[in-house]
Amino acid sequence: MTDTPSASDAEAPLRQAAPLWGAALIKDEVTRLPDAPGVYRMIGEADEVLYVGKAKSLKKRVVQYAQGRFHTNRIANMVDATRAMEFITTRTEADALLLEINLIKQLKPRFNVLLRDDKSFPEIVIRRDHDAPQLRKHRGAHTIKGDYFGPFASAWAVNRTLNTLQKAFLLRSCSDSVYDSRDRPCMLYQIKRCAAPCTGLIGKDDYQALVDQAEAFLRGKSRAVMATMAKAMEEAAEELEFERAARLRDRIRALSAVAQETQINPETVEEADVVALHVEGGQACVQVFFFRAGQNWGNRAYFPRITGAADDPEDETVTEEQRIITAFLGQFYDDKPIPRLILANVQPAESELLSEAFALKSGRKVEIAVPKRGEKADLVQHVLTNAREALGRKMAEGSAQTKLLAGVAEAFKLDAPPERIEVYDNSHIQGANAVGGMIVAGPEGFMKGQYRKFNIKSTELTPGDDYGMMKEVLRRRFARLVKEEEEGDDANRPDLVLVDGGQGQLDAAIEIMADLGVDDIAVVGVAKGPDRDAGLERFFIPGQTPFMLEPKSPVLYYLQRLRDEAHRFAIGAHRTRRSMDLKKNPLDEIEGVGPGRKKALLHAFGSAKGVGRASVEDLVKVDGVSQALAERIFGFFRKG
């Protein structure tokens, strides 16, 4: 006799265990974790990464989240929001730290301390892939073969040093193509900024001696270099070579000027970054001063995101300042040269581990120290004062910014102060090299890391069709936004869009945004006054009569700043595109003329114009140029 299944038995296959959340989920995960170093990620309901952490023992660290003994409510909130966890084991704890740093920068978790506006720094490179090494500014990955020196805190700092090096060591700064095409010295030789190796006015060995002196100076041997030059000047004077002595005198003066301009030149610090943290009112500022070759190469202030960051459940003795400085240093040096010495006002948590990780990255010992007395302590105190002042300025600006955004909301009848404002402008010359620019602003001011430029691609636009250009820019921008939102990516949706122009530009913007289904975003046209007078701007809002703001209104000044910044950015992008277009060499358009033949032709005739004037008979004399290619080149310059 066959048993008849009960109702409860029939329902059993349909019944599923409730998904685990929060502490229960973490407790379940712990049972499968190894007692090994690694990185863990806490995942939220929308598959967003809430937190990234590292551990010497994944099992021992993660179990603490399930035990309920939380240092602050922030950890409790993070645990409650966790619906999944992911783990990566590593060979050592130092490897885990490096991976944690990389993932935090990549994923930007809500509960981690996060370094914002982390831009690369300019450096100086002495190229080593040419008989006459070139001195130049560089930013980004070290793709050029040569010796790199930096970082410099700003373009101004690196340009000042380059200017000094040119005066003192007379090294070339021109590109290889310009160098190879010279048959007489350029203006830099005339003003004593280059020794003209391109034309043989200085021998190879003598030029290399200048390169060696420049390298020694950049490596911190400035006193030895200046002493050598002073001795050479005295010898020249004794031998009555007064012109050579005067040149050496000018070079020494140029080097001396650097020490005076950098203001802070410590005697006991050759190579170090000095880092100071100040925390106040739920905000933080980290000032970094760069010292290389015994000189101050500039400084920069950072304002890491610390609101919402979770504390370390493993060690309640770790202070907030220690957590912030540890996270900052890790993220800051993730993609930057690490100095041999880092001086700080706060001892990082796990300082020895951080030093070990930095040593792995840099291939040499890295010391992190908190000096208590002497010149180094004075340096740290000076940097801390700068951090405190910078945070004070930012907090004052933030308070004023909040009022301005509230005023913008009132002026344009928005439901709330805008968190993200996007401003658009175009720049071109009669339609040529047209570029659209987008700048972004919000409660923290201009968000320059989110600026975007749009090279106008349409070939159907009438030259100078500003409406058509604006449509293309907005279509590309908001089509991308729609795609990001559909795919669940971290999309940046603006609360307010400002377009430079009146009713026509506003209508163009509304048309595109309606087509893309983003017409819930507020759009305003900003038209300049008669004769482009500031203060007479008119504002265009859909369904409303154009209006003006009070001439001395702070909100009007703010909107003018936004418009001017968009204009500046668009013009800069246009000039860059136009400059690149002008630099295009017509030889690049000729089939069969590659880099080698191009170089040979320029060397033989000095310039593309010289090539264009050459006869077929002259062209075939150049190495690698056949009769057929010579005729093709000759015909190219004479077509039309």
Curated annotation (Swiss-Prot):
<dbReference type="InterPro" id="IPR003583">
    <property type="entry name" value="Hlx-hairpin-Hlx_DNA-bd_motif"/>
</dbReference>
<dbReference type="InterPro" id="IPR001162">
    <property type="entry name" value="UvrC_RNase_H_dom"/>
</dbReference>
<dbReference type="GO" id="GO:0009432">
    <property type="term" value="P:SOS response"/>
</dbReference>
<dbReference type="InterPro" id="IPR038476">
    <property type="entry name" value="UvrC_RNase_H_dom_sf"/>
</dbReference>
<dbReference type="InterPro" id="IPR036876">
    <property type="entry name" value="UVR_dom_sf"/>
</dbReference>
<keyword id="KW-0227">DNA damage</keyword>
<dbReference type="Pfam" id="PF01541">
    <property type="entry name" value="GIY-YIG"/>
</dbReference>
<dbReference type="GO" id="GO:0009381">
    <property type="term" value="F:excinuclease ABC activity"/>
</dbReference>
<dbReference type="Pfam" id="PF02151">
    <property type="entry name" value="UVR"/>
</dbReference>
<keyword id="KW-0234">DNA repair</keyword>
<dbReference type="InterPro" id="IPR000305">
    <property type="entry name" value="GIY-YIG_endonuc"/>
</dbReference>
<dbReference type="InterPro" id="IPR004791">
    <property type="entry name" value="UvrC"/>
</dbReference>
<feature type="domain" description="UVR">
    <location>
        <begin position="223"/>
        <end position="258"/>
    </location>
</feature>
<dbReference type="InterPro" id="IPR001943">
    <property type="entry name" value="UVR_dom"/>
</dbReference>
<protein>
    <recommendedName>
        <fullName>UvrABC system protein C</fullName>
    </recommendedName>
</protein>
<dbReference type="GO" id="GO:0003677">
    <property type="term" value="F:DNA binding"/>
</dbReference>
<dbReference type="GO" id="GO:0009380">
    <property type="term" value="C:excinuclease repair complex"/>
</dbReference>
<keyword id="KW-0742">SOS response</keyword>
<dbReference type="GO" id="GO:0005737">
    <property type="term" value="C:cytoplasm"/>
</dbReference>
<dbReference type="Pfam" id="PF22920">
    <property type="entry name" value="UvrC_RNaseH"/>
</dbReference>
<keyword id="KW-0267">Excision nuclease</keyword>
<comment type="similarity">
    <text>Belongs to the UvrC family.</text>
</comment>
<dbReference type="Pfam" id="PF14520">
    <property type="entry name" value="HHH_5"/>
</dbReference>
<dbReference type="InterPro" id="IPR035901">
    <property type="entry name" value="GIY-YIG_endonuc_sf"/>
</dbReference>
<feature type="domain" description="GIY-YIG">
    <location>
        <begin position="35"/>
        <end position="113"/>
    </location>
</feature>
<dbReference type="GO" id="GO:0006289">
    <property type="term" value="P:nucleotide-excision repair"/>
</dbReference>
<keyword id="KW-0228">DNA excision</keyword>
<dbReference type="Pfam" id="PF08459">
    <property type="entry name" value="UvrC_RNaseH_dom"/>
</dbReference>
<keyword id="KW-0963">Cytoplasm</keyword>
<dbReference type="InterPro" id="IPR010994">
    <property type="entry name" value="RuvA_2-like"/>
</dbReference>
<dbReference type="InterPro" id="IPR047296">
    <property type="entry name" value="GIY-YIG_UvrC_Cho"/>
</dbReference>
<comment type="subunit">
    <text>Interacts with UvrB in an incision complex.</text>
</comment>
<dbReference type="InterPro" id="IPR050066">
    <property type="entry name" value="UvrABC_protein_C"/>
</dbReference>
<comment type="function">
    <text>The UvrABC repair system catalyzes the recognition and processing of DNA lesions. UvrC both incises the 5' and 3' sides of the lesion. The N-terminal half is responsible for the 3' incision and the C-terminal half is responsible for the 5' incision.</text>
</comment>
